[in-house]
Swiss-Prot record:
Gene name as annotated: dnaK
Region named Disordered: 517-536
Induction annotation: By stress conditions e.g. heat shock.
Family: Belongs to the heat shock protein 70 family.
Name of this protein: Chaperone protein DnaK
Keywords for the protein's UniProt record, in alphabetical order: ATP-binding, Chaperone, Nucleotide-binding, Phosphoprotein, Stress response
Source species of the chain: Rhodopseudomonas sp. (strain No.7)
InterPro entries per UniProt: ATPase_NBD (IPR043129), Chaperone_DnaK (IPR012725), Heat_shock_70_CS (IPR018181), HSP70_C_sf (IPR029048), HSP70_peptide-bd_sf (IPR029047), Hsp_70_fam (IPR013126)
Phosphothreonine, modified sites: T198
Length: 631
């Protein structure tokens, strides 16, 4: 069995790790970095860039550079959060035929699962390069507060990337695994995870290799991206006051502002003041304009204070659901890049009444936990049991649009629960089961996961038929629902596929596209290699022809020059086969030139050798005594 890798598919950065002996190890990517920006770009000529190369060209290609796409995964186009995101990103968010939010570049649409798959492919390649073997199985992390549609979409992303996703694991739970595996500690810990796009808090009990999640809460639209945008808006407002130009209307300027904001935010975690300097940010009739501004940590903290405060309520709810007080938490573990911000650490300290634990790398700990879970599933890590929970209540819509819970939030998974319902009208022969996830009392206020019909119910007065609805949640937190008429034994079930979501045929098409793209990438690489080889051949042949062309006859010289000309022409295009063919023709034609060069070298060598022989003979001539005397 091949290695199973652990992947932290983050909003801003992603990370891959693998078990190495008894411990998990983070794998460096081709650029030598331990994390990879979760950014995908499409270039002018249709080439796809992932990670650092995509981030580097974002300023000059803002409309085709997709970042923070994780915030769109599993979301409908009309979701208020998507509406909010549309005004903040330079790329196009469009409505897919199934009603989901997708992204678009050059008229081609991509589902968030597809874009995430490009990032997962990069992580897969990183692991394969390190391990020297093919990798096709993974454990992938998601925010604990992700709903069913978002989990399913993440699993789809894995499939598109050519990975069998053995388990979807919650990010705070993965972090707790990494934190607690080597420690003999027992106790109750809180994992405070503020990342690039999402916030989670989980309360866990750890002891004797058992990691039991007691409760979880969070906000899937709160993270570093929001802190960046707060700063972007502040910089744009200040510039508009001064110059009368709104930089947000210029996509190129907006991307430069975003990069500067992210850099300033990071710097202000370790320094109390930073300078933002963006020359030639825009221009008007009077000439070019520059943006230069000093920003203090205090000002930045004031700008984002409400965002930091938004993390407090989920923490209180998680404590309440776990039946604990802050004083009963033995350790608070910080996860996610945003927890490096001093203000965040201060709020956590005030809330839990203790200094948070900073002994884990907030950018890598989740991937390490995923690799440990991969080790557990592979049988390499023994005596570890992970008991996670479902983050949101699950139920169905009943008479009057009421949301009737069947499984409450923070129920340990996997789990299975049933409840019996009946008909609302006399002689009703079919019922529609509408499945929802959330905490509101009315079904319409919650997230609808899907619906299905149970047909063929025998005619009976209302309230008589007995319909048993069963919810089954697997270890990935993905839901299956079935409904059974107890009188006839007729059963109908669905694996919940969000009312949007990707169909199996769409996933298969995207898998094929990904494979075709891999083939396309290989072709592109082969073309580059062929060009490099041909360039070198042209250069060496021209040099040899200039130096030794006089030693071959005119016909041979002409055929070399013709082959050179053909290859130069082929090099103007991208046809790898044509370049290879013309390279071979030139190599064949140049053989006579090579022979002439070798003949000359041999002749020169023989003459030199003859000269050497004379010298040697002279040196070792013996002279007898008689000759010496006569001399």
């Amino acid at each position: 069995m091949g290695k199973v890798i652990g992947i932290d598919l983050g909003t801003t950065n992603s990370c891959v790790a693998v078990m190495d002996g008894k411990s998990a190890k983070v794998i460096e990517n081709a650029e030598g970095m331990r994390t990879t920006p979760s950014i995908v770009a499409i270039t002018d000529d249709g080439e796809r860039l992932v990670g650092q190369p995509a981030k580097r060209q974002a300023v000059t290609n803002p409309e085709r550079t997709f970042f923070a796409v994780k915030r769109l995964i599993g979301r409908r186009y009309d979701d208020p959060m998507v509406e909010k995101d549309k005004g903040l990103v330079p790329y196009k968010i469009v409505k897919a035929s199934n009603g989901d939010a997708w992204v678009e570049a050059d008229g081609k649409t991509y589902s968030p699962s597809q874009v995430s798959a490009f990032i997962l492919q990069k992580m897969k390649e990183t692991a394969e390069a390190h391990l020297g073997q093919k990798v096709d199985q993974a454990v992938i992390t998601v925010p604990a507060y992700f709903n069913d549609a978002q989990r399913q979409a993440t699993k789809d992303a894995g499939k598109i990337a050519g990975l069998e996703v053995l388990r979807i694991i919650n990010e705070p739970t993965a972090a707790a695994l990494a934190y607690g595996l080597d420690k003999a500690k027992t106790g109750t810990i809180a994992v405070y995870d503020l990342g690039g796009g999402t916030f989670d808090v989980s309360i866990l009990e750890i002891g004797d290799g058992v990691f039991e999640v007691k409760s979880t809460n969070g906000d899937t639209f709160l993270g570093g991206e929001d802190f960046d945008m707060r700063l972007v808006n502040y910089l744009a407002d200040e510039f508009q006051k001064e110059q009368g130009i709104d930089l947000r209307k210029d996509k190129l300027a907006l991307q430069r502002l975003k990069e500067a904001a992210e850099k300033a935010k990071i710097e202000l975690s370790s320094t109390t003041q930073t300078e933002i300097n963006l020359p030639f940010i825009t221009a008007d009739q009077s000439g070019p304009k520059h943006l230069t501004m000093k920003l203090t940590r205090a000002k930045f903290e004031a700008l984002v204070d409400d965002l930091v405060q938004k993390t407090i309520e989920p923490c209180r709810k998680a404590l309440k659901d776990a039946g604990l007080t802050a004083g009963e938490i033995s350790e608070v573990v910080l996860v996610g890049g945003m927890t490096r911000m001093p203000k965040v650490q201060e709020v956590v300290k005030q809330l839990f009444g203790k200094e948070p634990h900073k002994g884990v790398n907030p950018d890598e700990v989740v991937a390490i936990g995923a690799a440990i879970q991969a080790g557990v599933l592979q049988g390499d890590v023994k005596d570890v049991l992970l008991l996670d929970v479902t983050p949101l209540s699950l139920g169905i819509e009943t008479l009057g649009g009421v949301f009737t819970r069947i499984i409450d939030r923070n129920t340990t998974i996997p789990t299975k629960k049933s409840q019996v319902f009946s008909t609302a009208e006399d002689n009703q022969n079919a019922v529609t089961i509408r499945v929802f996830q959330g905490e509101r009392e009315m079904a319409a206020d919650n997230k609808m996961l899907g619906q299905f019909d149970l047909m063929g119910i025998p005619p009976a007065p209302r309230g008589m038929p007995q319909i048993e609805v069963t919810f089954d949640i697997d270890a990935n937190g993905i839901v299956n629902v079935s409904a059974k008429d107890k009188a006839t034994g007729k059963e109908q079930q669905i694996r919940i596929q969000a009312s949007g979501g990707l169909s199996d045929s769409e996933i298969d098409k995207m898998v094929k596209d990904a494979e075709a793209n891999a083939a396309e990438d290989k072709k592109r690489r082969e073309a580059v290699d062929a060009k490099n080889h041909a360039d070198a051949l042209v250069h060496s042949t021209e040099k040899a022809l200039a130096e030794h062309g006089s030693k071959i006859d005119e016909g041979e010289r002409r055929s070399i020059e013709d082959a050179l000309s053909d290859l130069r022409e082929a090099l103007k295009g991208d046809d790898a086969e044509a370049i290879k063919t013309k390279s071979n023709t030139l190599a064949q034609a140049s053989m006579k030139l090579g022979e002439a060069m070798y003949k000359q070298a041999e002749a020169g060598g023989a003459a030199q050798q003859a000269g050497k022989d004379d010298v040697v003979d002279a040196e070792f001539t013996e002279v007898d005594d008689d000759k010496k005397k006569s001399a």
